[in-house]
């Protein structure tokens, strides 16, 4: 109790101080910051490590006790309206704070090597610490106003980090797209918060759920209005957690540095929407219409993300669509009332996907010295293959993450995903089909990513090359001037780029599925440099993340109920001795696995088909004449899937037609009206005043004869006008 009351405020404060110090040093004294950049990184890692240890200490003390809510000061003191700043410590807060700090520390250690030659090294750490402080402030917020402030800060940090390499037009466009898309959801969230206050008279999370339920019981609240308010509240999580139809920003957000993709767009920020739904779950659980809509929205998003990931060439975008799909699983679980399963999957997925993204960053970091620094090549899986023998640690840890996300026991995501599938079948047959089908697709595309990246032969030395003088690499600002020039000179001495065009073969060959980019002319060049294993800092983070990816799923095994169920307060979580006693019950584990056989069969089918198609990458997969008709059908289906996936389901295309182009036309029309209408009218008035003044100015010439002439002329003209227009009696 003492730790929670006195030291909980330290958790977000430490990274905030580190961010302010690093950012100020980088802005005001850039040369000093470049000279002491490693000390800046150490400061940020140390500050977040303090937050992690404080979170762990409070976790051990407070996890099984009642929630604590404490306010530090009053922000807006009014008699009728008062907003206070404080913190709320409960089991949900503690789990999220541990998740953010543990993943954040490992990402910072990883980034020290990944970003070491970048000129924005200290700026990167300042942004990273600011994000972790904002995220920790969000999960500790006791009221909706404080939560919304940190919600917007998290979005701002995402904007800064996605556009970190803002000199690249693709990164600049991606951060703007993410910002605008999230503004749509955040505006709905703000309206929902105001509607909650208008309905309940409170912003306090601990009060509004009870007040909302009481108002509904006595019939005081309007059912239509309450549903509208709840849907507005869900608009924020829909955008932040990349749910359909506001999911379009997430794949483009991969333009940021890969450590950011691991922390923000896989483990923490995109999970903020799930956290918010869980935080107000007592409110939305009383509204059946909202719950049903959430479940179907989550199911549709899960299936859509899985289908969009099936044929991606970009390694990071494939993982991004996978993240979108798994977030849909969580929203589906919350919509059907599987609250604990959703939170369990949030934790297991966060560690697994952070491991996968950092593994992808390790691959990209190594291979771009071979193929160049353009993301179109260094992130293209068809330039990879066979990397496991060059990068054994990265390959092994990536395989663990792949198996976990595919739902293979005893790894983490198996337990949570299986429970969600089980609850989906109990809730609704269509939702059960959606969840199960998505599980099979997940296993397929995850092993497709693994096989194309790590198995087979290194494809870069087996492709048709052209001279670098005709196709120079695109260097990005990830590397400093010296290292970048050295690396480019090294690559320029090699032969250069891969031909990505899809060749049209006259005869059918199913090798198109195994060799999707259509490269048929193979040239072996053994003189090219080979990828190497990443530095110890990067592999250390991978190994440390592999531990929770393997073991954290065991937290959710309810051995009494013999089902996978996320208990937020298991006794052995505080006393590890209990865990080793319970782990001896192998019969119960076997029963759980037998109950999960349907989802396991789907996962193994997905893995099996992935092996059939992609195991022999860049080798022809010959077939007998008897199967030609079937394989032609499969080929046509494969082309449809590829077109659907590479064109992002055509959703961005129709958004561009229906919204972007119309908004641009409207904005151009309004701009022309403002320029030629409003500004034109003002400019004409100004011009008339100017020329009128000039005309009058020439009348002041100082000649008495001229003045006398004007007076006489005016008198005569006035007399004539009076004589003409005024009748005389």
Swiss-Prot record:
GO molecular function terms listed in the Swiss-Prot or TrEMBL record: NADH dehydrogenase (ubiquinone) activity; quinone binding
Catalytic activities: a plastoquinone + NADH + (n+1) H(+)(in) = a plastoquinol + NAD(+) + n H(+)(out); a plastoquinone + NADPH + (n+1) H(+)(in) = a plastoquinol + NADP(+) + n H(+)(out)
EC number: 7.1.1.-
GO cellular component, one term: chloroplast thylakoid membrane
Subcellular location: Plastid, Chloroplast thylakoid membrane
Membrane-spanning ranges: 9-29, 39-59, 87-107, 125-145, 147-167, 184-204, 218-238, 258-278, 289-311, 327-347, 354-374, 395-415, 425-445, 540-560, 592-612, 627-646, 676-696, 708-728
Pfam families with a match to the protein in the record: Proton_antipo_C, Proton_antipo_M, Proton_antipo_N
Membrane topology: Multi-pass membrane protein
Record GO biological process: ATP synthesis coupled electron transport; electron transport coupled proton transport
Major enzyme class: translocase
Keyword list, A-Z: Chloroplast, Membrane, NAD, NADP, Plastid, Plastoquinone, Quinone, Thylakoid, Translocase, Transmembrane, Transmembrane helix, Transport
InterPro entries according to UniProt: NADH_UbQ_OxRdtase_chlpt_su5_C, NADHpl_OxRdtase_5_subgr, ND/Mrp_TM, NU5C-like, Proton_antipo_N
Signal peptide: none
Family, per entry: Belongs to the complex I subunit 5 family.
Subunit structure, interactors included: NDH is composed of at least 16 different subunits, 5 of which are encoded in the nucleus.
PANTHER family: NADH-UBIQUINONE OXIDOREDUCTASE CHAIN 5
Function: NDH shuttles electrons from NAD(P)H:plastoquinone, via FMN and iron-sulfur (Fe-S) centers, to quinones in the photosynthetic chain and possibly in a chloroplast respiratory chain. The immediate electron acceptor for the enzyme in this species is believed to be plastoquinone. Couples the redox reaction to proton translocation, and thus conserves the redox energy in a proton gradient.
Name of the protein in question: NAD(P)H-quinone oxidoreductase subunit 5, chloroplastic
Organism: Adiantum capillus-veneris
Upper lineage: Eukaryota, Viridiplantae, Streptophyta, Embryophyta, Tracheophyta
């Amino acid at each position: 109790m003492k730790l929670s009351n006195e030291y909980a405020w330290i958790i977000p404060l430490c990274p905030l101080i580190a961010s302010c110090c690093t950012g100020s040093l980088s802005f005001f004294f850039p040369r000093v910051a470049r000279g002491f950049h490693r000390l800046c990184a150490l400061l940020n890692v140390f500050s977040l490590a303090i937050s992690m240890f404080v979170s762990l200490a409070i976790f051990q003390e407070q996890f099984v006790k009642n929630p604590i809510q404490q306010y530090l000061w009053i922000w807006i003191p009014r008699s009728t309206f008062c907003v206070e700043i404080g913190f709320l410590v409960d089991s949900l807060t503690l789990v999220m704070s541990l998740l953010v700090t543990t993943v954040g520390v490992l990402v910072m250690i990883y980034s020290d090597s990944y970003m070491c030659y970048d000129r924005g090294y200290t700026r990167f750490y300042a942004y990273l610490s600011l994000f972790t402080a904002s995220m920790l402030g969000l999960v500790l917020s006791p009221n909706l106003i404080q939560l919304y402030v940190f919600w917007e800060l998290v979005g701002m940090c995402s904007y800064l980090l996605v556009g970190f390499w803002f000199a690249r037009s693709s990164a600049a466009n991606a951060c703007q797209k993410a910002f605008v898309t999230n503004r749509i959801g955040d505006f709905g969230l703000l309206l929902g918060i105001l509607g909650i206050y208008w309905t309940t008279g409170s912003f306090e999370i601990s009060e509004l759920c009870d007040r909302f339920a009481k108002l509904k019981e006595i019939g005081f609240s309007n059912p239509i209005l309450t549903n509208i308010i709840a849907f507005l509240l869900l608009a924020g999580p829909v955008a932040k957690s990349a749910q359909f139809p506001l999911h379009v920003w997430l794949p483009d957000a991969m333009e940021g540095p890969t450590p950011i993709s691991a922390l923000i767009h896989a483990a923490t920020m995109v999970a903020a929407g799930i956290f918010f739904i869980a935080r107000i779950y007592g409110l939305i659980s009383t509204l059946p219409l909202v719950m049903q809509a959430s479940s179907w929205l989550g199911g549709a998003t899960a299936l859509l993300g899985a289908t969009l990931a099936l044929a991606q060439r970009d390694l990071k975008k494939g993982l991004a669509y996978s993240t979108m799909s798994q977030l849909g699983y969580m929203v589906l679980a919350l919509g059907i009332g599987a609250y604990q399963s959703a939170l369990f999957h949030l934790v297991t997925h966060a560690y697994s996907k952070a491991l996968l993204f950092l593994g992808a960053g390790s691959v990209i970091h190594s291979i771009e010295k071979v193929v160049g620094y353009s993301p179109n090549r260094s992130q293209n899986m068809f330039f990879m293959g066979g990397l496991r023998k060059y990068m054994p640690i990265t390959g092994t840890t990536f395989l663990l993450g792949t198996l976990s996300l595919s739902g293979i026991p005893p790894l983490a995501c198996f337990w949570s995903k299986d429970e969600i599938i089980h609850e989906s079948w109990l809730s609704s047959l269509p939702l059960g089909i959606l969840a199960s089908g998505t599980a099979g697709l997940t296993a397929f595309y995850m092993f497709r990513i693994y096989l194309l990246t790590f198995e087979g032969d290194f494809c870069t030395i087996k492709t048709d090359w052209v001279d670098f003088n005709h196709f120079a690499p695109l260097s990005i600002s990830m590397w400093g001037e010296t290292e970048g020039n050295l690396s480019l000179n090294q690559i320029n001495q090699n032969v250069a780029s891969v031909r990505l065009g899809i060749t049209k073969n006259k005869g059918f060959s199913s090798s198109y599925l195994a060799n999707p980019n259509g490269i048929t002319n193979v040239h072996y060049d053994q003189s090219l440099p080979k990828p190497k294993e990443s530095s110890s800092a990067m592999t250390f983070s991978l190994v440390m993340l592999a531990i929770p990816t393997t073991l954290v799923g065991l937290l959710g095994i309810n051995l009494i109920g013999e089902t996978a169920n996320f208990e937020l307060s298991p006794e052995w979580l505080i006393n590890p001795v209990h865990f080793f006693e319970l782990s001896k019950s192998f019969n119960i584990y076997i029963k759980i696995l037998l109950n999960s056989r349907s989802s396991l069969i789907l996962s193994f089918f997905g893995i099996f088909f992935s092996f059939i198609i992609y195991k022999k990458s860049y080798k022809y997969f010959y077939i007998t004449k008897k199967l030609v008709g079937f394989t032609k059908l499969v080929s046509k289906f494969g082309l449809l899937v590829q077109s659907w996936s590479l064109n992002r389901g055509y959703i961005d295309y129709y958004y561009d037609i229906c919204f972007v182009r119309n908004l641009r036309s409207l904005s151009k029309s309004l701009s022309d009206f403002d320029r030629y209408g409003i500004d034109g009218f003002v400019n004409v008035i100004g011009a008339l005043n100017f020329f009128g003044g000039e005309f009058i100015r020439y009348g002041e010439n100082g000649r008495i004869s001229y003045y006398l002439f004007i007076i006489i002329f005016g008198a005569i003209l006035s007399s004539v006008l009076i004589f003409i227009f005024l009748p005389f009696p």
